[in-house]
Regions:
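Short acidic/glycine-rich loop or secondary-structure boundary segments that cap or lie
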Residues: 163-166, 206-209, 240-244, 258-259
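Generic solvent-exposed, charged/amphipathic alpha-helical segments
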Residues: 19, 218-222, 262, 266
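N-terminal Rossmann-like NAD(P) cofactor-binding subdomain of oxidoreductases
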Residues: 1-194, 230, 258, 263, ...
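Histidine- and/or cysteine-centered catalytic micro-motif in compact active-site loops
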Residues: 37, 158, 199-203, 234-236, ...
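Helix-loop-beta segment of a Rossmann-like dinucleotide-binding subdomain
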Residues: 121-128, 197-208, 311-313
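C-terminal active-site/capping subdomain that shapes the small-molecule cofactor and substrate pocket
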Residues: 229-341
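A glycine-rich, Thr/Ser-enriched phosphate-binding loop motif common to dinucleotide/cofactor-binding enzymes
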Residues: 125-136, 209-218, 321-325
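Oxyanion-binding "anion nests"
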Residues: 194-241
Length: 341
């Protein structure tokens, strides 16, 4: 007994990670299909470490009738074409693109934060997965908001190149190698050299001077957690392959000591607190890669504002920021709304 699942975009970074996580979490499957563009038709992908190979089908020709859920990791343009088709056929779409996140008829879900919002999925038969940088942030904020009511958040991100896909990872690798041997580098995926550099620019610029990535963090956090929270973000691309980091300053309505915050975070779902005030007593992206937890370190009181705290938040962006959250949504949907076939 299980569900019939489709993974769309199975040849990309996030799609492959979805397959890994479905396998490692032993998701109850009656059947699984993998689809992608015509370029990948006939290719084979691994179903995690099970030893099972799955043949990629052309999404354009795939009939979703009779399938329970589809995990989409195919980008907004392809999602715009295929998500309505899958949803109309009765296959619930869990979408990793930005296309539907702010649609009022589509729930935007982080299961540790707003699981009850999933009950509204039937309006479109589509559920949205948040931006990678938003997902880990709201996991960290939720238990603290419940305890002391957050007024304002200031976040600076340090986002890995895998957030820009395989091309971003390839560009960091190739530029690093070129610099070591004295060759020149030409940016392609990124606007400037990414190797041995940081770039304060992710996605397009908006009229107010912010970037779309920063806007996403603001509006998605409000939709998922609380529309009254004020948030400002600066999003930066850094020369790290996997793992997003965030320096977060939080201002609360009510007093919350660093010690009390640590106790709350230690017990919160999805969070691993690693916070020793000593050399190496914190988590970096290297340790988070391949892990499902959202790691919190450096929790301390901010003396410049009343009821303020600072913290450091790290997570594998391909997992909690994308693939893991999608699988967790599928698990939640199955428990609450779907019957196993």
């Amino acid at each position: 007994m299980g569900y019939r699942i489709v993974v769309a975009g199975a040849t990309g970074n996030v799609g492959r990670e979805m397959l890994n996580i479905l396998a490692e979490r032993e998701f109850p499957l009656a059947d699984i299909a993998v689809v992608a563009s015509s370029r990948s038709q006939g290719d084979e992908v691994d179903f995690g470490e099970t030893g099972r190979k799955l043949k990629v089908q052309n999404i354009d020709n795939f009939d979703p009738t009779g399938w329970d859920m589809a995990l989409f990791a195919i980008g907004s343009d392809a999602t715009k074409i295929h998500a309505p088709r899958f949803a109309a056929a009765g296959c619930t779409v869990i979408d990793n693109s930005s296309l539907y996140r702010m649609d009022p008829d589509v729930p935007l879900i982080v299961p540790e934060v707003n699981p009850d919002a999933i009950d509204g999925y039937k309006k479109r038969n589509i559920i949205a997965n948040p931006n990678c940088s938003t997902a880990q942030l709201v996991v960290a904020l939720k238990p603290l908001h419940d305890a002391a009511t957050i007024k304002r958040v200031v976040v600076s991100t340090y986002q890995s190149v895998s957030g820009a896909g395989k091309s971003g990872m390839d560009e960091l690798f190739e530029q690093s190698r070129a610099i070591f041997v004295g060759d020149s580098v030409e940016p392609a995926t990124f606007t400037k050299q990414i190797a041995f550099n940081v770039i304060p620019h992710i996605d397009v610029f908006l009229d107010d001077g912010s970037t779309k990535e920063e806007w996403k963090m603001v509006v998605e956090t409000k939709k998922i957690l609380d529309p009254k929270i004020k948030l400002t973000a600066t999003c930066v691309r850094v020369p790290v392959f996997v793992g997003h980091s965030e320096a977060v300053t939080i201002e609360f309505e009510n007093e919350l000591s660093a010690e009390a915050a640590q106790d709350i975070l230690r017990e919160a779902p999805g969070i691993m607190l690693v916070d020793k005030r000593e050399d190496g007593g914190y988590v970096t992206p290297v340790e988070s890669a391949g892990d499902s937890a959202t790691y919190i370190s450096r929790v301390r009181e901010d003396p410049t504002v009343e009821n303020g705290l600072n913290l450091w938040c790290v997570s594998d962006n391909l997992r909690k920021g994308a693939a893991l959250n999608a699988v967790q949504i599928a698990e939640l949907l199955g428990r609450r709304h779907l019957q196993k076939g």
